[in-house]
Amino acid sequence: MSSITTQKPNITVCGSGSGGLAVAADLAMAGCRVNLYEIPAFSSNLEPIREAGGITLSGLPYYGKTGMARLNLVTADPAAALAGSELVFVNVPAMAVGPFLTEMAAHFEPDQVIVVTTGYWAAFRFRELLTETGAFDRYIFTEMALMPYLSGKAGPAAVEIGNWKRALYLSAWPATGNQKALAAVQKVYPQTRLCRNVLELNFRPGNPGVHVQIALPKAEFFFERARQFRFYGEVSRCASKLTDAHDVERMAVAAAFACETDTWPDDCRTIYELEGSNLYEQHGGPADRHAQKWNHIEEIERLLVEDICYSFIPMEQLASVAGHSTPVTTAMTDLSAVLSGYDYRSEGLTLAQMGLDGLTVNEIIDYADTGRYR
């Protein structure tokens, strides 16, 4: 439980899924003026919130208050949603970030700090739109490694927070905006820490997650029989071994790009205060809130697409630039495609799509730092 110690900033929260409702409700209960925005295609999701007069918040929010969270504005109008806000949190899956930025970018206001809480190389993927609309001189664009909460919808206008992150990691693109971004976000989440650049941020554990590593050892269950289940309650010792092996590859590629990062177990000790030396020991017990959360197969299928298409595949390609190989990551990608029937590689994020094709390691680092090609 915490409190805002500086002047309460005005907030815009984007996305009406569980992540967006969790951020909107908790910060509104903390005293922020909160606008909730949804793109027009999904504006019907806002009607229950308007009818209820806000969002019912339960569980374990960061600011410790539960009940009815009253919002300043609930809208599908991007200009109205963004007006007067210091911070803009975009809380949607990787594949949904594009539609939100396309609707909003022209309406970003001077000095606003835009935070995509799911990372997944958002800055590089949308670099042209960001450059055209003022990411270098008008507003600050940032990525986080993870959403601030473990949450789930408890109804069309209700959200339950199962846990909150004791550490959040952030970087701006270009990295010259890091200090201003950090100062703004720490007004509401003082546990936020800075990564050197968006390269370092995207090499952190979290996003990528461990959904592939958990699913593969129990492939028959997840790909043939599972419909509703406690996903983290299915963590096996084999999943731990895959996680450790992936960590070795991920951390080696990160080091080649002058980035520091943690293992998954070390990160879980930091952000969730979980004890244990590996994935199984941390998530395999009844005390773990992740293991208590119910999931649907459709949610896990989406998470596999995110982790593989937006993390595993670009990491393979960055490894190649640095002269490294990623045999475990490659094997998990290809085996997941065979067992799920989903062609991840046809949708995987490429260096060309990220604007990094043909660049050297040092040129990629420089691009992350400055936003400029040499």
Where are the regions a protein language model picked out?
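NAD(P)+-binding Rossmann beta1-loop-alpha1 motif at the extreme N-terminus of oxidoreductases
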Residues: 2-61
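Active-site-lining helix/loop region of Rossmann-like oxidoreductase modules
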Residues: 166-267
